[in-house]
């Protein structure tokens, strides 16, 4: 039996948006869905119970970081990642490809795999597609990723073509190495930079390999938004309708809406948790930097329209005070709010698809939030 099962429930009549159900070994997920990021087996500042309270059904964790610390063998001894971190809902792990790409000066790419130095202590390591599968098998996540090379932006055509070829070869090797297919679904990752022919070729060749789902990687790495949207549009066209599609590392409110319109089902991003720790929050009227002086005597909630724990109980003035005093609670309250905001946004998007009014929803949301409708 397959580890996951995707059911397409409804398609939007005027866009490529889809409403779906993704069944995993650790629960059923309504899509489109946003996945909070728990890089080191924790969503920063949140307990698993709090994540459940805000409606998170799946989180993301990171193969590269967990391999280096505490080590996948230790997590395996603990009974797997779910038990280790006390999270009984679904987990997706990424392959570490993006993290190694970020270490440009500390890595060497070969056909066999990638040699890199740990960002923690400088020790040498070697990742192959097989090794990455072995690590993720030990972690026991529900959805795992093929090892890929995330080409930088900008990069010339030849470099990206070679990088794409490598990603396809690695996907094949990873698929052969993956034995735990009944409990873990392996996704192929579509690369190809901003080159349409490469994206098309990569998608088609991965689809021939018949993965249970497909990721769109190598975007949101510095390219203009309209270019990213065009590539997503083009890529989803070549992906099967009966499999989930995951846009990696994308999670601002406008990107979530635009991604859904282009047929994406799953998203993840560190943005909501990272900006929360720096005192920036999402509101229905746009971003707000709560640590700024104007909020010193503002006793209204972060967002009048939000019913998260933070907004029901605390004022902007209080949260600003916590940030100014470097109190840990500041990051916790802002993180709870930001993740709740995005999870609620996805709920509203799903409802808009259900009612066939996603474009109207986008128009209203963008106008209120302060986005220009230029895409």
From Swiss-Prot:
<feature type="binding site">
    <location>
        <position position="306"/>
    </location>
    <ligand>
        <name>Zn(2+)</name>
    </ligand>
</feature>
<feature type="binding site">
    <location>
        <begin position="94"/>
        <end position="98"/>
    </location>
    <ligand>
        <name>substrate</name>
    </ligand>
</feature>
<dbReference type="InterPro" id="IPR002616">
    <property type="entry name" value="tRNA_ribo_trans-like"/>
</dbReference>
<feature type="binding site">
    <location>
        <position position="148"/>
    </location>
    <ligand>
        <name>substrate</name>
    </ligand>
</feature>
<comment type="pathway">
    <text>tRNA modification; tRNA-queuosine biosynthesis.</text>
</comment>
<feature type="binding site">
    <location>
        <position position="191"/>
    </location>
    <ligand>
        <name>substrate</name>
    </ligand>
</feature>
<dbReference type="GO" id="GO:0046872">
    <property type="term" value="F:metal ion binding"/>
</dbReference>
<keyword id="KW-0819">tRNA processing</keyword>
<keyword id="KW-0479">Metal-binding</keyword>
<dbReference type="GO" id="GO:0101030">
    <property type="term" value="P:tRNA-guanine transglycosylation"/>
</dbReference>
<keyword id="KW-0862">Zinc</keyword>
<comment type="similarity">
    <text>Belongs to the queuine tRNA-ribosyltransferase family.</text>
</comment>
<dbReference type="GO" id="GO:0002099">
    <property type="term" value="P:tRNA wobble guanine modification"/>
</dbReference>
<comment type="subunit">
    <text>Homodimer. Within each dimer, one monomer is responsible for RNA recognition and catalysis, while the other monomer binds to the replacement base PreQ1.</text>
</comment>
<dbReference type="GO" id="GO:0005829">
    <property type="term" value="C:cytosol"/>
</dbReference>
<keyword id="KW-0328">Glycosyltransferase</keyword>
<dbReference type="GO" id="GO:0008616">
    <property type="term" value="P:queuosine biosynthetic process"/>
</dbReference>
<feature type="active site" description="Nucleophile">
    <location>
        <position position="268"/>
    </location>
</feature>
<feature type="binding site">
    <location>
        <position position="337"/>
    </location>
    <ligand>
        <name>Zn(2+)</name>
    </ligand>
</feature>
<dbReference type="InterPro" id="IPR004803">
    <property type="entry name" value="TGT"/>
</dbReference>
<keyword id="KW-0671">Queuosine biosynthesis</keyword>
<dbReference type="InterPro" id="IPR036511">
    <property type="entry name" value="TGT-like_sf"/>
</dbReference>
<feature type="binding site">
    <location>
        <position position="311"/>
    </location>
    <ligand>
        <name>Zn(2+)</name>
    </ligand>
</feature>
<dbReference type="GO" id="GO:0008479">
    <property type="term" value="F:tRNA-guanosine(34) queuine transglycosylase activity"/>
</dbReference>
<feature type="active site" description="Proton acceptor">
    <location>
        <position position="94"/>
    </location>
</feature>
<keyword id="KW-0808">Transferase</keyword>
<feature type="binding site">
    <location>
        <position position="218"/>
    </location>
    <ligand>
        <name>substrate</name>
    </ligand>
</feature>
<protein>
    <recommendedName>
        <fullName>Queuine tRNA-ribosyltransferase</fullName>
        <ecNumber>2.4.2.29</ecNumber>
    </recommendedName>
</protein>
<dbReference type="Pfam" id="PF01702">
    <property type="entry name" value="TGT"/>
</dbReference>
<dbReference type="InterPro" id="IPR050076">
    <property type="entry name" value="ArchSynthase1/Queuine_TRR"/>
</dbReference>
<feature type="binding site">
    <location>
        <position position="308"/>
    </location>
    <ligand>
        <name>Zn(2+)</name>
    </ligand>
</feature>
<comment type="function">
    <text>Catalyzes the base-exchange of a guanine (G) residue with the queuine precursor 7-aminomethyl-7-deazaguanine (PreQ1) at position 34 (anticodon wobble position) in tRNAs with GU(N) anticodons (tRNA-Asp, -Asn, -His and -Tyr). Catalysis occurs through a double-displacement mechanism. The nucleophile active site attacks the C1' of nucleotide 34 to detach the guanine base from the RNA, forming a covalent enzyme-RNA intermediate. The proton acceptor active site deprotonates the incoming PreQ1, allowing a nucleophilic attack on the C1' of the ribose to form the product.</text>
</comment>
<feature type="region of interest" description="RNA binding">
    <location>
        <begin position="249"/>
        <end position="255"/>
    </location>
</feature>
<feature type="region of interest" description="RNA binding; important for wobble base 34 recognition">
    <location>
        <begin position="273"/>
        <end position="277"/>
    </location>
</feature>
